[in-house]
A protein has these predicted regions:
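Polybasic "coupling" helices that flank or enter modular domains
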Residues: 116-146
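Short, small/polar residue-rich loop motifs at catalytic or cofactor-binding pockets
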Residues: 20-21, 39-41
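Short phosphate-coordinating micro-motif centered on Lys-Gly-acidic
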Residues: 33-39
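Cyclic nucleotide-binding regulatory module and flanking cytosolic helices
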Residues: 1-30, 75, 79-84
Length: 148
């Protein structure tokens, strides 16, 4: 696994970790819905191949792509970490894609075994969420400059 989420985790620990996180992989065809608004937001998705779009309808019913998520990236982590019970967005395959899903609740709560890899995984997730936060803050800054 090359995803940043698994950085500094020993290769031999990954199969055990994925089993404990109830990981499963699913293939989606282009334009197929991966998750619908209103579905439980208790997962973290990792795009193994292809890409996905995060879609949201505005007040007038217009559908907007709020994010395009490339391969080897995460989605759903902000909702899972924030404890938001249901997705406020649709997630659709932008092209044929394969997605691995991890149980967000299990990932965020360390097990009784106090596995080293679990602590590393949580630290890696925090780093990913922080980087996305900084990117979005920069985006807000640029967008606000456009309107000056």
């Amino acid at each position: 696994m090359t995803n940043t989420l698994f950085q500094n985790i020993l290769p031999e620990d990954i199969p055990v970790m994925l089993k404990r996180l109830n990981a499963y992989t699913k293939f989606y065809q282009k334009e197929e819905y991966i998750k619908h608004a209103g579905d439980p937001a208790d997962f973290i998705g990792i795009i193994e191949s292809g890409s996905v779009h995060i879609l949201q309808d505005d007040y007038y019913g217009n559908r907007n792509i709020t994010a395009s998520i490339p391969p080897d990236s995460l989605f759903g982590e902000a909702f899972a970490c924030a404890g938001i019970p249901y997705l406020p967005v649709d997630i659709v395959a932008a092209e044929d894609c394969t997605v691995m899903f991890l149980n967000g609740k299990t990932l965020l709560n360390t097990c009784d075994n106090s596995c080293t890899f679990h602590h590393t995984l949580i630290r890696n997730l925090l780093g990913i969420v922080a980087q996305k936060n900084m990117y979005l803050n920069q985006k807000i800054k640029y967008l606000s400059l456009i309107h000056i």
